[in-house]
From Swiss-Prot:
Residues that bind heme b: H119, H144, Q146, H148
EC main group: oxidoreductase
SMART domains assigned: Cyt-b5 (SM01117)
Pathway given in the UniProt record: Energy metabolism; sulfur metabolism
UniProt region (Hinge), positions on chain: 166-175
Gene (UniProt): Suox
Residues with Phosphoserine modification: S124
Name this protein carries in UniProt: Sulfite oxidase, mitochondrial
Cofactors (names): heme b; Mo-molybdopterin
Pfam families: Cyt-b5, Mo-co_dimer, Oxidored_molyb
Reactions it catalyzes: sulfite + O2 + H2O = sulfate + H2O2
Subunit structure, interactors included: Homodimer.
Transit peptide per record: 1-80
Main location: mitochondrion
Length: 546
């Protein structure tokens, strides 16, 4: 009787529960031998008189447990059959530990709040995706796209994304920015229209080469959508030479040249100048700088084919982009002809970025890359090149991107008196830890970047943990570069011991290049009304916890 009753209960339980429930499995083992009432464990001792009573108790327990587990399985199946539906706004509102941390993957919604502290890459990395999709971050870190990671994530599923939110909303045709490309959600946006954004510090120095999706973006106008098949680059010929109209295929016929170059916006770290006195410009933090491997035709080769040669008199190569405002005014800039014609300067008409065609935000199909020179001269969506006796008359060459004395204000400024920024000064910044965060005592890792314009190599980065009283030399990482052709940054790192009794750290970094240029210690003496050339010692204040 009892064995038959047990078997009927066990068969009635869901197969998955019978296999996975440890308590139930032990009960099954205790009652499924040929002598079903024979004790299977020393603690289970039945006398002949009460064995039947005890057996019924075991069966009662089994029946109750089976009912509970069967009901739980029913609820799980019902939940799977009818998942809760959440809107994109629901997910977006859960973007911190107080509200809960929700993310999406495909059509599924997950509450990963309890996993944040367990994330192998650290809490800060996972929080970058809080309130949004995981796909852009998994694209950066392919290690996530593994079956066991998806199985782990499945434990945190809470529902499905509303089907209406799985499609991008329609764009207004009259909006000049309606055709802008999609951007990576990790980017910190400083301006939506035109789009300007920087990668967060914790991602910026994760790798020597900045992944294309998180390369800082500096746009002045709407992003043009150019057809590579009909694209033409117009190069004005020299007197007696021949003007060129080059297709993308024509550019590919020139010898391909590759070079690793760091681009930095003139306004990088402008936010620190704004704390001293208000400036005009985007609130760039430390991320208006990135590094890529660029490939394309050398500008000197293209100019030579158009009949251009070095001149004894001053001359400038002027660039005009295909991005324009409603009046038809395009972005423009220029560099000295001497730099453009020097093969060692490695100026490119680039059509590849990190082995891929240029992304639209970064100048597709062709942009200028001028190693060692401020990002403002790296004209994107290049449409026209000419050689002139004077620099470009573009607003961004003549009336912007110039440095001034701290005494100059908007009532006294004269842009004609200041030269246009070309090469940038020595620069460094701390990317880990971030200002206002906490670190644990013991070994602390300090990370950052350093770079200098004009091909000058970074030879040293000094780091202080106590506000400048004492200094330690950081370890430099990155490619070895030729003298006077150090076009790319150095990533640096310092491992420092912090005693348990330490309460706070005032971390500072400063870099030195091979001309022994060093960063100024404070912002005030280099303040200027446009907030450019901000390269004072970078300072980070953190609390220490045991």
């Amino acid at each position: 009787m009892l064995p038959r009753l047990y078997r009927s209960v066990a068969v009635g339980l869901p197969r998955a529960i019978r296999a996975k429930s440890t308590p139930l499995r032990l009960c099954i083992q205790a009652c499924s031998s040929s002598d079903s009432l024979k004790p299977q464990h020393p603690s289970l001792t039945f006398s002949d008189d009460n064995s039947r009573t005890r057996g019924w108790k075991v069966m009662g327990t089994l029946i109750g447990l089976g009912a509970v587990l069967a009901y739980h399985d029913h609820r799980c199946r019902a939940s799977q059959e009818s998942p809760r539906i959440y809107s994109k706004e629901d997910v977006r509102s859960h973007n911190n530990l107080k509200t809960g941390v929700w993310v999406t993957l495909g059509s599924e919604v997950f509450d990963v709040t309890k996993f944040v502290d367990l994330h192998p890459g650290g809490q800060s990395k996972l929080m970058l995706a809080a309130g949004g999709p995981l796909e852009p971050f998994w694209a950066l870190y392919a290690v996530h796209n593994q079956p066991h990671v998806r199985e782990l994530l499945a434990e945190y599923k809470i529902g499905e994304l509303n089907p209406e939110d799985r499609m991008s909303p329609p764009l207004e045709a009259s909006d000049p920015y309606s055709n802008d490309p999609m951007r990576h959600p990790a980017l910190r946006i400083n301006s939506q229209r035109p789009f300007n954004a920087e990668p967060p510090p914790e991602l910026l120095t994760e790798s020597y080469i900045t992944p294309n999706p998180i390369f800082f973006t500096r746009n002045h106008l709407p992003v043009p959508n150019l057809d590579p098949d009909t694209y033409r680059l117009h190069v004005v010929g020299a007197p007696g030479g021949q003007s060129l109209s080059l297709s993308l295929d024509d550019l590919h016929k020139f010898p391909k040249h590759e070079v690793t170059v760091t681009l930095q916006c003139a306004g990088n770290r402008r936010s620190e100048m704004n704390k001293v006195k208000e400036v005009k410009g985007l609130e760039w933090r430390t991320g208006a700088i990135s590094t890529a491997r660029w490939a394309g035709a050398r500008l000197c080769d293209v100019l030579a084919q158009a009949g251009h040669r070095l001149r004894e008199t001053e001359a400038h190569v002027c660039f005009e982009g295909l991005d324009s405002d409603p009046t038809g005014t395009a972005y423009g800039a220029s560099i000295p002809l001497a730099r453009a014609m020097d093969p060692q300067a490695e100026v490119l008409l680039a059509y590849e970025m990190n082995g891929q065609p240029l992304p639209r935000d970064h100048g597709f199909p062709v942009r200028v890359v001028v190693p060692g020179v401020v990002g403002a001269r790296h004209v994107k969506w290049l449409g026209r090149v000419s050689v002139e006796s004077e620099e470009s008359y573009s607003h961004w060459q003549r009336r912007d991107y110039k440095g001034f004395s701290p005494s100059v204000d908007w009532d006294t400024v004269d842009f004609d008196l200041a030269p246009s920024i070309q090469e940038l000064p020595i620069q460094s910044a701390i990317t880990q830890p971030q200002d206002g965060t906490t670190v644990e005592s013991g070994e602390v890792i300090i990370k950052g970047y350093a770079w200098s314009g004009g091909g000058r190599a970074v030879i040293r980065v000094d780091v202080s943990m106590d506000g400048g009283l004492t200094w330690q030399e950081a370890e430099l990482e990155g490619e070895e570069q030729h003298p006077r052709k150090a076009w790319a940054w150095r990533i640096w790192q310092l491992k420092a011991h912090v005693p348990a009794e330490q309460k706070e750290l005032n971390i500072i970094c400063k870099a030195v290049d091979d001309s022994y240029n060093v960063q100024p210690d404070t912002v005030a003496p280099i303040w200027n009304l446009r907030g450019v050339l901000s390269n004072a010692w970078h300072r980070v204040h953190v609390q220490v916890v045991p």
